[in-house]
């Protein structure tokens, strides 16, 4: 659920939504539009969103996509937390392409709502040649994402924010607190880019 954002400083882009070293992202660093997704690998609506988001990524090579691992089901289903940590470690160790392959492979298992296994995670990690022995610590990154989600008023997944990479304001940012279609996401990208055509 989205409780709203305080726009008083007019600096949504400076809120931690823009890409930074610790957060997985895919797409050009100088993109004019950024799409940020908060997700949990065990969330069924995140799983339904995954193929829609994959379509949008392929259709928008000029947009930056930022992935905020937000394992809200981690206490109920430990694999949520394990998958999130592994994803962040792959990002830091192997980069954007390996991360996106891992991310999509986890969703491709079709295992959510408590069905994701350690074997699923290991297989997806092995496929991108992840070396667990040299994996960096990512707890600080997860804590930062959790704090940001709380600041934004997100308590569930998925949650998406589509914003221009510079000059974000209440007028050109779209917040989607829940599942959405590729078409609706594309409209939000066009809106953030300043394309007013309907």
Residue ranges and their predicted role:
Residues 27, 36, 177:
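Residue-level detector of conserved, well-ordered beta-strand and adjacent loop positions
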């Amino acid at each position: 659920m989205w409780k709203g954002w305080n726009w008083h400083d007019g600096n949504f882009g400076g809120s931690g939504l823009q890409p930074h070293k610790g957060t997985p992202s895919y797409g050009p660093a100088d993109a004019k539009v950024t799409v940020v997704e908060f997700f949990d690998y065990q969330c069924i609506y995140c799983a339904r969103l995954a193929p829609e988001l994959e379509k949008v990524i392929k259709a928008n090579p000029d947009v930056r996509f930022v992935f905020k691992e937000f394992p809200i089901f981690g206490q109920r289903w430990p694999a949520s937390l394990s998958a999130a940590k592994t994803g962040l470690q792959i990002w830091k160790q192997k980069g954007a392409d390996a991360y996106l392959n891992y991310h999509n492979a986890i969703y491709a298992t079709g295992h959510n709502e408590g069905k994701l296994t350690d074997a699923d995670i290991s297989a997806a990690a092995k496929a991108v040649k992840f070396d667990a022995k040299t994996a960096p610590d990512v707890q600080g990154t997860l804590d930062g994402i959790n704090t940001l989600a709380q600041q934004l008023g997100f308590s569930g997944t998925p949650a998406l924010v589509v914003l221009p990479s510079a000059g974000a304001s209440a007028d050109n940012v779209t917040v989607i607190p829940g599942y959405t279609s590729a078409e609706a996401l594309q409209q939000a990208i066009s809106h953030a880019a300043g394309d007013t055509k309907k």
